[in-house]
C-alpha cells in the first residue's frame, strides 16, 4: 500500500538529518484482510490480501527508518479488536501479528503507542506539542483536533498535508503531516476527499517547553530540504 517514491524520500531525509527522535504516527501496515467491511463481504478482494507480505513490508520500512516510537493507527488497531474474536483462528492470527510487531519494536528499542482516538494514552509530547495518529475525519480535522486536545498537535489520520489554527484564546495549531500511501488506492476511489491526499511528513526542533513544527509536502515535486 505504501508508495516507494514517498517512503524513499522520507528515508533519504531521515538519513541526512539524523534526528534524535523519529516517530511513525501510524498505519505502517494496512491489514486489509482484517478490515470490518472485508469480513462482512464474502466477495471483497481485501479478504485475499496477503497479511504476511503486508506485515513484512511495514516492519522493514520501520526498521530502515529506525523509529523510536510507533503509534498504532486505526489500521493496526484492527488487530486489537480481532485478538478477542470468538473465531479462534482469527484471534490466533491477530495475536501472532501483534507479537511479531512487538518483537520488531523491541529489537529497535522503540515504544509502541496504543491507538485510542484522542485520549491521553495515545498521545506523546515534545515541548508544547502533542503527537498522535488522530481520529477526526473532516475538512477541518487539523483545527478540530487542536481544539479537542487544547494543544498544538501533529497527526496523520486524514492523509493530507494541512495546517490550521484552533479557534481558542491560546494560539494552538493543528498540523496534518500527510501520508506515504499510494494516492490512488482502490478502496477509496469513490471518495472525493482522496483528491486532497498528499505525501508528506513533519520535522522540526524541540526543547523542554517548545516545539517548532515544519511540514513537508512531497507530492508532486518531491523536493527535500537538504
Spell out what each predicted region is.
Residues 2-108:
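Core catalytic region of metal-dependent phosphoesterases/phosphodiesterases
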Residues 4-5, 112-115, 134-137:
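Short gly/ser/thr-rich secondary-structure transition/capping motifs
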Residues 8-11, 56, 117-120, 138-143, ...:
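A generic local structural motif
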Residues 22-25, 67-73, 114, 131-133, ...:
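A structural signal for short, well-ordered beta-strand segments and their strand-loop junctions
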Residues 42-47, 124-130:
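Short, basic, glycine/proline-bearing loop/turn elements
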Residues 78, 82, 216-226:
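C-terminal/domain-terminus segments
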Residues 86-127, 158, 179:
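Active-site-proximal loop/helix segment associated with metal-binding centers of metalloenzymes
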Residues 128-216, 222:
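Conserved beta-sheet core of the metallophosphoesterase superfamily
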Amino acid at each position: 500500500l505504501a508508495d516507494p517514491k514517498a517512503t524513499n524520500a522520507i528515508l533519504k531525509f531521515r538519513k541526512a538529518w539524523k534526528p534524535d527522535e523519529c516517530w511513525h504516527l501510524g498505519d505502517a501496515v494496512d491489514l486489509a484482510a482484517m478490515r470490518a467491511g472485508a469480513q462482512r463481504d464474502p466477495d471483497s478482494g481485501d479478504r485475499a490480501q496477503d497479511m504476511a507480505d503486508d506485515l513484512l513490508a511495514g516492519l522493514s520500512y520501520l526498521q530502515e527508518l529506525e523509529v523510536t516510537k510507533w503509534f498504532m493507527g486505526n489500521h493496526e488497531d484492527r488487530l486489537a479488536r480481532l485478538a478477542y474474536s470468538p473465531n479462534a483462528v482469527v484471534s490466533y492470527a491477530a495475536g501472532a501479528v501483534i507479537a511479531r510487531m512487538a518483537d520488531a519494536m523491541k529489537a529497535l528499542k522503540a515504544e509502541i503507542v496504543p491507538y485510542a482516538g484522542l485520549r491521553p494514552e495515545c498521545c506523546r509530547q515534545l515541548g508544547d506539542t502533542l503527537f498522535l495518529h488522530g481520529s477526526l475525519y473532516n475538512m477541518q480535522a487539523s483545527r478540530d483536533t487542536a481544539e479537542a486536545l487544547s494543544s498544538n498537535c501533529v497527526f496523520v489520520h486524514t492523509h493530507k498535508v494541512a495546517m490550521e489554527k484552533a479557534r481558542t484564546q491560546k494560539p494552538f495549531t493543528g498540523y496534518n503531516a500527510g501520508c506515504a500511501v499510494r494516492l490512488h488506492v482502490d478502496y477509496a476511489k469513490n471518495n472525493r476527499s482522496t483528491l486532497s491526499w498528499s505525501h508528506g511528513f513533519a520535522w522540526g526542533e524541540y526543547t523542554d517547553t517548545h516545539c517548532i513544527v515544519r511540514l513537508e509536502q512531497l507530492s508532486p515535486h518531491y523536493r527535500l530540504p537538504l
